[in-house]
C-alpha cells in the first residue's frame, strides 16, 4: 500500500495535532463515491476471470463470478429452482461506498476517550487507526468498565449476522467477551418477542421457529387456509441458513388448487399481500381488517362458533383446560359486553355477517390457520397469539393433517418435508475457561434483560420492570459492543435511541457496512462479508436438504478481517487466545465441524466423505428420504404419553400461571385491550390518521442489502425508500405517484417516495423495515431522515409486562407532500474521514485497490 508508514498515527500524535484538523481536502473521495460508478473501470479487456465459485447466503446458494479479484456477478446455484431476485445485489454487498474499509475511531472519542462529548455521536467524523491501536482501545475499555463498574455495565448483542456454521459473529462475540468477563445478556428477539413468550405458557413451546405440517399433507387435506398476517411468498426468499427455496413448489401447487376451487384461501390483512396477489386477487377472499383490531375479530369468531354450536366440545374437554374461565368474558357476563360480531364490526371494520360467515366456513371443513409474526408486534401482541390457539382449539383440528394452527409458515422453508440428514455444529459462544474478571456481582441489578427494553436500561437505570413472571432491575449500562447486528434498524423510536446513546460512555461496532449503528459508534472495526472467507452451511432449513461448501469468493477487502481473527487478537491481549481458538485456524475449524457431522451421521446411518474430498471435489451433498410431518399429531394421538410443556400438559385457554402474575395488561385468558394509539377511530387517530406498517421488505433482509445500488434501483422512488399509500388517502393529500413526501408524527419525521396503490386499505400506509437511517443533521434529536427509516416513527414500548417485546406495529403517522429543501441521500457513503493536516494522508487518496 502506498504511504503505508504515513498511515499509522499514534493516539498521542493525533491528539497533539487535532487542533489543526480540517475537513476540506480530507474527505476520502473513494469513501464518498459509489463503487458502482467505477465498476466499469475494474473490468478491463483480458482481465482474469474465475466463474462458478460456489457459496451460500441468507438469500440462497450462488455461483459467483470474479474478474480481477472483484466479485461481479452471482448466478443461482443449479439446485435452487426458485432463486431469489435479491442475489443480484450480492456483489454490491462486497463492493460499495458504505463498506467499512479500516478500523476507525470517532474523532471526539479519540480526543477524550470515554469522557467524550457523546452528543457528537452520529456526526460521522472518524479518524483511521491501525488494527493494533483499535484492539488496544477495545481491550482497555473492557478492562476499565469491568474494574470501574463490574459486569452490570456491559451489554453485548448480535443479530442476523451472515450465514455459515463457523463464521458466526454472535458466537465469536459471546466467547471472546465471556473469556474477559461477565456482562449483561438479553432475552427474546424483535421478530417474535410476544409470541415466543406467551405460546410456551399456552401450548408448551415457542412454535414460531418450528417445523410446520408438511405441505403435501396440507394440500391434500385442507379445504380452507386462513392467512392471518402472513406473507409467505415474499418472506421465504431469505432464511436463517442458506435456503433451498423448495417451498415455492408447494406455493405453485397451492395456486393450482385455489384456481380449481379445491382449496379456499382467506387473507386477513389490511393489505393485499404478495402471497394474496400471487394466488390471485380475485381468487382469495380478502378480509381487509382495520389494523390492530385482530383480537376483536378473533373473539367474534369464537363467539359465533360457541353460540351457533360449531365448536368441538370434545376437543376442548380432552385437550384443553380453562375454556370455562374464558367463556364468561367471551359472553360478556363480566363486563356486560358480549364479544359478538356486531361488537367487533365497530372496531375491525368487517361486516358482522361476514364475520359470522367466516366462522361457519372455518368450522365447516378442514381449516389450516397460518399466522404470521407482524401482528404480534403490536401492543398486547400476546393476546392475538393466544387467540389464534383458542380458535384452532375450538375448531378441534389441532394435530390433524391440514388443520390446526402454525406461526412459522413464512420462515425457513416451513412445511417442506424434512430429510433424514445431519445438522452441523458450529463455533459456540460458550466456554469452560474462566474469565479474567470473574465477578458475578451485578450489584443488585439483573444480569438478563428483555432485548426490546435495552434502551430503557440506558435511559432509566435502576427501574424495576416485570417480565414473564420475574422482577427485573434494569442495569446502568455504560458500554455496548455490537457484532453482526444493527440496533438502529431493529429497535424502535430512533430519536429515543439517540437520546440513550448519549448516556453510554463507549460503543463498539464490528460490521462490514457503515450502518447507522456504526456511524453512532466510537470504535468501528471492519469485518469481512461471507464472500471473503471459507465456511460450511446447511442447504435448506426445515427441509435439511443438504450441506454446501461456502468457498471464498474474493480476498478480504481493504483491511477487513474475519470476526474470528478480530476476536482472536483481542483475546491475545488478555491471555485467552488459546481458549478462544482451541488451537485451530479457519480450515481447522471447518474440518472439526465436518468430523463432528460425520460422527453424527454414523449414528443415523449416513456416511459422509472425508472433508478433503467434499471440499475439493464435491462441494455439495444432498440427503435422502423426505419425511412427512404433522404438527401436534403426537399430542393429539396420546395427550397422556405426549403432553405439552404446559403445567397441565394440555392447551391452556386459561393460564393460572399468568393469572397469578397479576398483570393488568396480560391476564389469565386472552382479552381485547385498547391500544395507546390506533387508527380508524382509535386513540390518537384524529391527529395522526394513518396506520404505518413496517413489515419485512421485498428486496433485502432487514437492513442487509439496503446498501445495494443494484437493488435500490428496482424499488427506490426518487432515491428514497418507498411509502405505500391508498389512492383515497393520497388524493386527499394532493399526493401523486412518485412524489417525495414527509411522513411524520410526534416522534420524528422521514422523507419517502410515494407509491399509490389500491393494495393498501384506506388509512393504511407502509414503509418496509430495514431502510437505512439518514439524518440531515447527524446526532440531532430533531433530524429529518432523508432516506426513510420507519423506526424514526415507531413507538418504543413493551407489548405488555409479560413479554416486554417490541410494539412496532402500534404506530400512527400523517403524510404530506414535501416541498422543502432536497438534500442528497448520504446514508450509503462512508464516514467523513478526519485527518491531521500535512501529517496524515487517507489511504483513499491513493489507489483504493493497493
Swiss-Prot record:
- State if Oxidoreductase is listed as a keyword: yes
Cofactor(s) needed by this chain: Mo-bis(molybdopterin guanine dinucleotide)
Disulfide-bonded cysteine pairs: these are none
Q: Per its UniProt entry, what is the enzyme's top EC class, as one word?
A: oxidoreductase
Question: Which reaction is this enzyme known to catalyze?
Answer: trimethylamine + 2 Fe(III)-[cytochrome c] + H2O = trimethylamine N-oxide + 2 Fe(II)-[cytochrome c] + 3 H(+)
Q: Which GO terms describe its biological process?
A: anaerobic respiration
The keyword Oxidoreductase is assigned to this record:
yes
- EC no. given is 1.7.2.3
Briefly state the modifications made to the protein after translation.
Answer: Predicted to be exported by the Tat system. The position of the signal peptide cleavage has not been experimentally proven.
Q: What is its main location?
A: periplasm
Q: Which residues form the signal peptide?
A: 1-39
Cofactor, free-text remark:
Binds 1 molybdenum-bis(molybdopterin guanine dinucleotide) (Mo-bis-MGD) cofactor per subunit.
**Per UniProt, which keywords does this protein have?**
Metal-binding, Molybdenum, Oxidoreductase, Periplasm, Signal
Question: What domain of life does the native source organism fall in?
Answer: Bacteria
What terms describe the molecular function in GO for this protein? electron transfer activity; molybdenum ion binding; molybdopterin cofactor binding; trimethylamine-N-oxide reductase (cytochrome c) activity
Compartments where found? Periplasm
**GO cellular component entries:** outer membrane-bounded periplasmic space
Where Mo-bis(molybdopterin guanine dinucleotide) is bound, by residue? 191
Q: Which family does it belong to?
A: Belongs to the prokaryotic molybdopterin-containing oxidoreductase family.
What role is this protein assigned?
A: Reduces trimethylamine-N-oxide (TMAO) into trimethylamine; an anaerobic reaction coupled to energy-yielding reactions.
Its name, as the record gives it, is Trimethylamine-N-oxide reductase
Q: Which organism is it from?
A: Salmonella typhimurium (strain LT2 / SGSC1412 / ATCC 700720)
Amino acid at each position: 500500500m502506498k504511504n503505508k508508514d504515513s498511515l499509522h498515527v499514534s493516539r498521542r500524535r493525533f491528539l497533539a495535532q487535532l487542533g489543526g484538523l480540517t475537513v476540506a481536502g480530507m474527505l476520502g473521495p473513494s469513501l464518498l463515491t459509489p463503487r458502482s460508478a467505477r465498476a466499469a473501470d475494474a473490468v478491463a479487456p483480458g482481465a482474469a476471470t474465475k466463474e462458478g465459485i460456489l457459496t451460500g447466503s441468507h438469500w440462497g446458494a450462488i455461483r459467483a463470478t470474479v474478474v480481477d479479484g472483484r466479485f461481479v456477478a452471482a448466478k443461482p446455484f443449479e439446485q435452487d429452482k426458485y432463486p431469489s431476485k435479491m442475489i443480484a445485489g450480492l456483489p454490491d454487498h462486497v463492493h460499495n461506498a458504505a463498506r467499512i474499509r479500516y478500523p476507525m475511531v470517532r474523532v471526539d472519542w479519540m480526543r477524550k476517550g470515554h469522557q467524550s462529548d457523546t452528543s457528537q455521536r452520529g456526526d460521522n467524523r472518524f479518524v483511521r487507526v491501525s488494527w493494533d491501536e483499535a484492539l488496544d482501545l477495545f481491550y482497555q475499555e473492557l478492562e476499565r468498565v469491568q474494574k470501574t463498574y463490574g459486569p452490570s455495565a456491559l451489554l453485548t448483542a448480535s443479530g442476523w449476522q451472515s450465514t455459515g456454521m463457523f463464521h458466526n459473529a454472535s458466537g465469536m462475540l459471546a466467547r471472546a467477551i465471556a473469556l474477559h468477563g461477565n456482562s449483561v445478556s438479553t432475552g427474546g428477539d424483535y421478530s417474535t418477542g410476544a409470541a415466543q413468550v406467551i405460546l410456551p405458557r399456552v401450548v408448551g413451546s415457542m412454535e414460531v421457529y418450528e417445523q410446520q405440517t408438511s405441505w403435501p399433507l396440507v394440500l391434500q387435506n385442507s379445504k380452507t387456509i386462513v392467512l392471518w398476517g402472513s406473507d409467505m411468498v415474499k418472506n421465504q426468499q431469505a432464511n436463517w441458513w442458506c435456503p433451498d427455496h423448495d417451498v415455492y413448489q408447494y406455493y405453485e401447487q397451492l395456486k393450482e388448487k385455489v384456481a380449481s376451487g379445491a382449496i379456499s384461501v382467506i387473507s386477513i390483512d389490511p393489505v393485499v399481500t404478495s402471497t394474496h396477489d400471487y394466488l390471485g386477487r380475485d381468487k382469495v377472499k380478502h378480509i381487509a381488517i382495520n389494523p390492530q383490531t385482530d383480537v376483536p375479530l378473533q373473539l367474534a369468531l369464537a363467539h359465533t362458533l360457541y353460540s351457533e354450536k360449531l365448536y368441538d366440545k370434545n376437543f376442548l374437554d380432552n385437550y384443553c383446560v380453562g375454556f370455562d374461565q374464558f367463556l364468561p368474558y367471551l359472553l360478556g357476563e363480566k363486563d356486560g359486553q358480549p364479544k359478538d360480531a356486531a361488537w367487533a364490526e365497530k372496531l375491525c371494520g368487517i361486516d358482522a355477517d361476514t364475520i359470522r360467515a367466516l366462522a361457519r366456513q372455518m368450522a365447516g371443513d378442514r381449516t389450516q390457520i397460518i399466522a404470521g409474526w407482524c401482528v404480534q408486534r403490536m401492543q398486547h401482541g400476546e393476546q392475538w397469539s393466544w387467540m389464534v390457539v383458542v380458535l384452532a382449539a375450538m375448531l378441534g383440528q389441532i394435530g390433524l393433517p391440514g388443520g390446526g394452527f402454525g406461526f412459522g409458515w413464512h420462515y425457513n422453508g416451513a412445511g417442506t418435508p424434512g430429510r433424514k440428514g445431519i445438522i452441523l455444529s458450529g463455533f459456540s459462544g460458550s466456554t469452560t475457561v474462566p474469565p479474567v474478571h470473574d465477578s458475578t456481582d451485578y450489584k443488585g441489578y439483573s444480569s438478563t434483560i428483555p432485548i426490546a427494553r435495552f434502551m430503557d436500561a440506558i435511559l432509566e437505570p435502576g427501574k424495576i420492570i416485570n417480565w414473564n413472571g420475574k422482577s427485573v432491575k434494569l442495569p446502568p449500562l455504560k458500554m455496548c459492543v455490537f457484532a453482526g447486528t444493527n440496533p438502529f434498524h431493529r429497535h424502535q423510536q430512533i430519536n429515543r435511541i439517540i437520546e440513550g446513546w448519549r448516556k453510554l460512555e463507549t460503543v463498539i461496532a464490528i460490521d462490514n457496512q457503515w450502518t447507522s449503528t456504526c456511524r453512532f459508534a466510537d470504535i468501528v472495526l471492519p469485518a469481512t462479508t461471507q464472500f471473503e472467507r471459507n465456511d460450511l452451511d446447511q442447504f435448506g432449513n426445515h427441509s435439511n436438504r443438504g450441506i454446501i461448501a461456502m468457498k471464498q469468493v474474493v480476498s478480504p477487502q481493504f483491511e477487513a478481517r474475519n470476526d474470528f481473527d478480530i476476536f482472536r487478537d483481542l483475546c491475545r491481549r488478555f491471555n485467552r487466545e488459546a481458549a478462544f481458538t482451541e488451537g485451530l485456524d479457519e480450515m481447522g475449524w471447518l474440518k472439526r465441524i465436518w468430523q463432528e457431522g460425520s460422527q453424527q451421521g454414523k449414528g443415523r446411518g449416513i456416511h459422509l466423505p472425508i472433508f478433503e474430498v467434499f471440499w475439493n471435489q464435491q462441494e455439495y451433498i444432498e440427503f435422502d428420504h423426505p419425511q412427512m410431518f404433522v404438527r401436534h399429531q403426537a399430542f393429539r394421538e396420546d395427550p397422556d404419553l405426549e403432553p405439552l410443556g404446559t403445567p397441565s400438559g394440555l392447551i391452556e385457554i386459561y393460564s393460572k400461571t399468568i393469572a397469578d402474575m397479576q398483570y393488568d395488561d396480560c391476564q389469565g385468558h386472552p382479552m381485547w385491550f385498547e391500544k395507546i394509539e390506533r387508527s380508524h377511530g382509535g386513540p390518537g387517530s384524529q391527529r395522526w390518521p394513518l396506520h404505518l406498517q413496517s413489515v419485512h421488505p421485498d428486496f433485502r433482509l432487514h437492513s442487509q442489502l439496503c446498501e445495494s445500488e443494484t437493488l435500490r434501483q428496482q424499488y427506490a422512488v426518487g432515491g428514497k425508500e418507498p411509502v405505500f399509500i391508498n389512492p383515497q388517502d393520497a388524493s386527499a393529500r394532493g399526493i401523486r405517484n412518485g412524489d417525495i413526501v414527509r411522513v411524520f408524527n410526534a416522534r420524528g419525521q422521514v422523507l419517502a417516495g410515494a407509491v399509490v396503490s389500491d393494495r393498501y386499505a384506506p388509512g393504511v400506509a407502509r414503509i418496509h423495515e430495514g431502510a437505512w437511517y439518514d439524518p440531515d443533521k447527524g446526532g440531532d434529536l430533531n433530524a429529518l431522515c432523508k432516506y426513510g427509516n420507519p423506526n424514526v416513527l415507531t413507538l418504543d414500548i413493551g407489548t405488555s409486562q409479560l413479554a416486554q417485546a417490541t410494539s412496532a406495529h402500534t404506530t400512527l403517522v400523517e403524510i404530506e407532500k414535501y416541498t422543502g429543501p432536497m438534500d442528497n441521500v448520504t446514508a450509503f457513503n462512508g464516514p467523513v474521514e478526519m485527518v491531521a493536516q500535512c501529517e496524515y494522508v487517507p489511504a483513499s487518496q491513493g489507489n483504493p485497490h493497493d
